[in-house]
Amino acid sequence: MVTVFDAVSDRAQRVRHPEKAHRPDTEVLRKPDWIRVKAPTSKGYQETRSIVKSHKLVTVCEEAGCPNIGECWDKKHATFMIMGEICTRACAFCNVATGKPNALDLDEPANVAKAVKQMGLSHVVITSVDRDDLDDGGAEHFEKVIFAIREASPETTIEILTPDFLRKPGALERVVAAKPDVINHNLETVPSNYLTVRPGARYFHSIRLLQRVKELDPTMFTKSGIMVGLGEERNEVLQLMDDLRTADVDFLTIGQYLQPSRKHHKVEKFVTPEEFKSYETVAYTKGFLMVSSSPLTRSSHHAGDDFARLKAARERKLAAAE
């Protein structure tokens, strides 16, 4: 995740996506004051970076260009991205490189577990690129990473942010059986945007995936997130909330889409903090246990603190029902 500046960074200007090379440049809008963040320079940031590099790990923080990297890494929080740094999908919003992935690193589960222990993480988030090239979409690798972390750091809670495992029968079941504490799968945007923003995915397949998690394990916490500013209408966001509640999703995150480069989908609108607060208020009335809605909200931002609040919210709900 790179720091957000007014100009597109040199890194963002490099075309990491061959499929986007033919696209015309889109205008990169000047970011409003409420989205400015400082460049990461702290000692904690440098220490986290050193640990990540020493174990030859990939983080979505760097690969996706997250604006919160300075804050998170200063606190020694990081989201590990497993199964390589090359994705088989070509989403119009994403800065992760697209192409033919390398073979899985068989040492990665152990290396992630070592890093988690070295960083002293009480809560860790594990995500991945899409691996449509693998028969199980990478489900077994997720399982191995979860087991390795459990063995090395049994007190650490584990949150996984999964791909959709489209056309990978049995993959989700294997991941749920590995017993992470939270399963997150992001819808990313409203269904009317899928053909242009997330063409390799299917909106209702993602809804069904989240619903299936609860069928397999009703006690599992589920989570999903979207970006706004991609041209969606407010009523579409509210309908998406209803779809997620139909799937009994516990936690919703809503953040501002930020354009990684001129070859990516343009920012149609910078949603104001007041509008984000309104979304949060409505989402709580629809029954979500937890909602995080702000311009800089990201799926794994403050994930550890949010998990503690999520557990407390469920306990209050259960107590009220007695």
Curated annotation (Swiss-Prot):
The keyword Oxidoreductase belongs to this UniProt entry's keyword annotation: no
Location of the protein in the cell: Cytoplasm
CDD domains for the chain: Radical_SAM
Positions annotated to bind [4Fe-4S] cluster 1: C61, C66, C72, S300
InterPro entries, alphabetized: Aldolase_TIM, Elp3/MiaA/NifB-like_rSAM, LIAS_N, Lipoyl_synth, rSAM
Entry GO MF terms: 4 iron, 4 sulfur cluster binding; lipoate synthase activity; metal ion binding
Domain Radical SAM core: 73-289
Coarse class of the protein's main subcellular location: cytoplasm
Enzyme class: transferase
Keyword field: 4Fe-4S, Cytoplasm, Iron, Iron-sulfur, Metal-binding, S-adenosyl-L-methionine, Transferase
Pathway the protein takes part in: Protein modification; protein lipoylation via endogenous pathway; protein N(6)-(lipoyl)lysine from octanoyl-[acyl-carrier-protein]: step 2/2
EC number assigned by the record: 2.8.1.8
Xref: SMART domains: Elp3
Free-text remark on how the cofactor is bound: Binds 2 [4Fe-4S] clusters per subunit. One cluster is coordinated with 3 cysteines and an exchangeable S-adenosyl-L-methionine.
Reaction catalysis annotation: [[Fe-S] cluster scaffold protein carrying a second [4Fe-4S](2+) cluster] + N(6)-octanoyl-L-lysyl-[protein] + 2 oxidized [2Fe-2S]-[ferredoxin] + 2 S-adenosyl-L-methionine + 4 H(+) = [[Fe-S] cluster scaffold protein] + N(6)-[(R)-dihydrolipoyl]-L-lysyl-[protein] + 4 Fe(3+) + 2 hydrogen sulfide + 2 5'-deoxyadenosine + 2 L-methionine + 2 reduced [2Fe-2S]-[ferredoxin]
GO CC terms: cytoplasm
Cofactor annotation: [4Fe-4S] cluster
Residues engaged in binding [4Fe-4S] cluster 2: C87, C91, C94
Family per similarity comment: Belongs to the radical SAM superfamily. Lipoyl synthase family.
Matching PANTHER family: LIPOYL SYNTHASE, LIPOYL SYNTHASE, MITOCHONDRIAL
Record-given protein name: Lipoyl synthase
